[in-house]
Amino acid sequence: MAFELPKLPYAFDALEPHIDKETMEIHHDKHHNTYVTKLNAVVEGTDLEAKSIEEIVANLDSVPSDIQTAVRNNGGGHLNHSLFWELLTPNSEEKGEVVEKIKEQWGSLDEFKKEFADKAAARFGSGWAWLVVNNGQLEIVTTPNQDNPLTEGKTPILGLDVWEHAYYLKYQNKRPDYISAFWNVVNWEKVDELYNAAK
């Protein structure tokens, strides 16, 4: 069965002024859609068609070598963005078990946000910043390009796209401003749900 572009769970302009409508439209309808189209083209006729995107990305080593890079890039792009849309909301509320766990590990939510923001800003070139569950503990990691922590056996529960296409129309070269705005639209309810499923 072909992979599909998921519908956004909110309107394109719902995250204004933090993430602008035009960026959301291009990011979802063009960038994410291209990953889906290319992924479907590369897995067509292989046994990967029957697998979930999570299963494929978690087991990249078992993907045939001639298509592994294309699957890594486009499969990762599809998985990362599918998760990213769900992790955003116009109604951000900092609550849940995961927030308490963050405070326990980092001392405060602000300390966590600072470390996450620093790592996201320091990610050279294109990539992602993640909060993952690793052996029952929370950890902040970054990945290059469209790599996903699942490939390393870590479960992502919060992710931030730091590719320029995610912010350049509004923030230009000011990635730290985009990262700062991100906290206003984090769907902590979804983060908490993913945390409880992964711990």
Swiss-Prot record:
Enzyme class: oxidoreductase
Classification via Gene3D superfamilies: Fe,Mn superoxide dismutase (SOD) domain, Iron/manganese superoxide dismutase, C-terminal domain
Cofactor remark from the record: Binds 1 Mn(2+) or Fe(3+) ion per subunit.
Sites where the protein binds Mn(2+): 27, 81, 161, 165
Entry keyword DNA damage: no
Co-factor(s): Mn(2+); Fe(3+)
Pfam families for this protein: Sod_Fe_C, Sod_Fe_N
InterPro entries, sorted: Mn/Fe_SOD, Mn/Fe_SOD_BS, Mn/Fe_SOD_C, Mn/Fe_SOD_N, Mn/Fe_SOD_N_sf, SOD_C_sf
Keyword Cell division: no
EC number: 1.15.1.1
GO cellular component terms, semicolon-separated: cytoplasm
Catalytic activity entry: 2 superoxide + 2 H(+) = H2O2 + O2
Protein residues bound to Fe(3+): 27, 81, 161, 165
GO molecular function: metal ion binding; superoxide dismutase activity
Alphabetized PROSITE patterns for the sequence: SOD_MN
Record's keyword terms, sorted: Iron, Manganese, Metal-binding, Oxidoreductase, Stress response
Entry's family note: Belongs to the iron/manganese superoxide dismutase family.
Known function: Destroys superoxide anion radicals which are normally produced within the cells and which are toxic to biological systems. Catalyzes the dismutation of superoxide anion radicals into O2 and H2O2 by successive reduction and oxidation of the transition metal ion at the active site.
Assembly and binders: Homodimer.
UniProt name for this protein: Superoxide dismutase [Mn/Fe]
Gene name tied to this protein: sodA
